[in-house]
């Protein structure tokens, strides 16, 4: 999607749809309606007849009779004193959705000055909302190939200061959109398109376009590193595992890297502890952690942030077969620790364990892993909030602040020592499942056994990685959750 900034007024716009905003304020709304009626007399009847009051996310469409600007959309922002950055994101999303419904290809949005919100932040919010809501995973739909799509987006303002601030965030916004779109596409892709080998090829391709060094460790190398967790989960699949290493060097050579680890289970049947048939098709998204980790490093690189970042992705399928690992097996990980397999559907923590051990070789500044790890997190937090656990207060604080800025909510869960009792084994160091109670916490505690001497945080995106319906700027399907969060963390490191 093409983005441009224009230091012009409303009358100078040339777009299929032009969006302007109004607060829920009688005096301000009356003034705006008067101004619009003066500039566009043909719209006066609609302005008088439509009961538009400026409430948040409400909108009316005015027909101007002007070929270069046939429609003006008036969108409500709600009470002026209640305006937030998230309100602006949602307003941008309303503009893009309404424009798409009109089969518009070009959209201009007015970047108004907002009290208490910087021009850069308000501009970014409008762009985010408009761009993120414009996503559809439709590559396999063979009908309507000629259907018009929104492809050009202009932010216009009469203020030189606002225009300058907006121009300063265009590259960042484009990078964000590219990273989120990549993550969504990877998560939504069917398993016959994205499996370990093709995920690795995708990483190589996007890495080349973003000046990211990509190294693919094959099964032989994985075996030599004694990554027992990744190898055990892979036993049931005819497709070999891969371990993806992506390195972006935007900081100083002496700067320690920020490491992102993403769970890359490209399809999860549950293995021998097989899942119910209902909803199993969604298990193509069990690699959303990997999708977001790859999308995040691409976004960071495209935004040219001055930081060193490494993404690690252990990838395999979890399949049942005569050679699959089974409950009761004991496996040895890269760091020498052993685990009893209680449930083969608790496989994500096994592949992440080896990746967290491998992360130590980079002497990282911090490590954050993302994974669709536990159904328990969905029960606890639903599809709205990501579970956060970790060992470092500063890192968790950075994540929480980024979550507030991006509206990608997180909620911290405790890692109290008493929960360790739930993953004790009689025959190995630990076991891979602690039962139904505190499932999200015990999964994180399992991972804690494999971290090195570095600050670590774990994000359980089991609920937030997939949406069952379209919401404001989150589409149905893979959400791309975590990309904007990680990009914001890197930006403010």
PLM regions with names:
Residues 1-264:
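Short amphipathic alpha-helical segment within the helicase RecA-like ATPase core
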Residues 51-52, 200-493:
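A generic structural signal for tightly packed, nonpolar segments enriched in small/aliphatic residues
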């Amino acid at each position: 999607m093409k983005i441009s900034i224009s230091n012009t007024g409303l009358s100078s716009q040339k777009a299929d749809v032009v969006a302007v905003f109004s607060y829920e304020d009688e005096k301000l709304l009356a003034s705006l309606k008067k101004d619009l009626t003066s500039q566009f007399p043909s719209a006066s009847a609609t302005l008088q007849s439509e009961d538009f009051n400026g409430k948040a996310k409400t909108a009316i469409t005015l027909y101007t009779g002007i070929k270069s600007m046939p429609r003006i959309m008036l969108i409500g922002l709600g009470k002026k004193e209640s305006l937030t950055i998230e309100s602006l994101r949602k307003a941008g999303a309303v503009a893009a959705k309404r424009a798409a419904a009109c089969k518009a290809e070009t959209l201009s949005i007015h970047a108004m000055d907002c009290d208490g919100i910087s021009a850069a932040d308000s501009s970014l919010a409008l762009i985010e909302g408009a761009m993120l809501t414009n996503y559809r995973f439709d590559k396999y739909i063979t009908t309507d190939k000629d259907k018009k799509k929104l492809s050009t987006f202009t932010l216009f303002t009469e203020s030189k200061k606002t225009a300058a601030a907006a121009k300063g965030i265009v590259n960042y916004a484009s990078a964000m959109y590219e990273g989120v779109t990549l993550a969504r596409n990877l998560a939504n892709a069917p398993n016959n398109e994205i499996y370990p080998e093709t995920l690795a090829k995708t990483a190589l391709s996007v890495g080349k376009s973003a000046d990211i060094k990509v190294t693919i460790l094959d099964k032989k190398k994985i075996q030599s590193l004694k990554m027992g967790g990744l190898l055990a989960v892979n036993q049931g699949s005819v497709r070999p595992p891969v371990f993806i290493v992506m390195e972006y060097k935007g900081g100083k050579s002496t700067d320690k890297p920020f490491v992102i680890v993403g769970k890359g289970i490209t399809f999860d049947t549950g293995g021998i502890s097989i899942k119910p048939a209902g909803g199993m098709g969604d298990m193509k998204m069990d690699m959303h952690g990997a999708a977001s980790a790859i999308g995040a490093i691409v976004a960071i690189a495209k935004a040219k942030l001055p930081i060193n970042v490494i993404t690690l992705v252990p990838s395999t399928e979890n399949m049942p077969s005569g050679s699959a690992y089974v409950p009761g097996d004991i496996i040895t990980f890269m760091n020498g620790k052993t685990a009893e397999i209680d449930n083969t559907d608790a496989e994500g923590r096994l592949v992440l364990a080896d990746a967290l051990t491998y992360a130590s070789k980079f002497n990282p500044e911090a490590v954050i892993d993302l994974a669709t790890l536990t159904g328990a997190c969905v029960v606890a937090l639903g599809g709205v909030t990501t579970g956060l656990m970790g060992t470092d207060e500063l890192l968790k604080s950075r994540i929480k602040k980024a979550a507030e800025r991006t509206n990608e909510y997180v909620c911290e869960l405790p890692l109290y020592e008493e929960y360790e009792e739930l993953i004790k084994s009689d025959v190995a160091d630990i076991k891979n499942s602690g039962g139904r109670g505190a499932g999200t916490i015990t999964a994180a505690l399992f991972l804690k056994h494999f971290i090195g001497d570095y600050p670590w945080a774990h994000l359980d995106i089991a609920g937030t990685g997939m949406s069952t319906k379209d919401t404001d700027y989150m589409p149905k399907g893979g959400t791309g959750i975590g990309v904007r969060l990680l990009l914001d963390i890197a930006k403010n490191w």
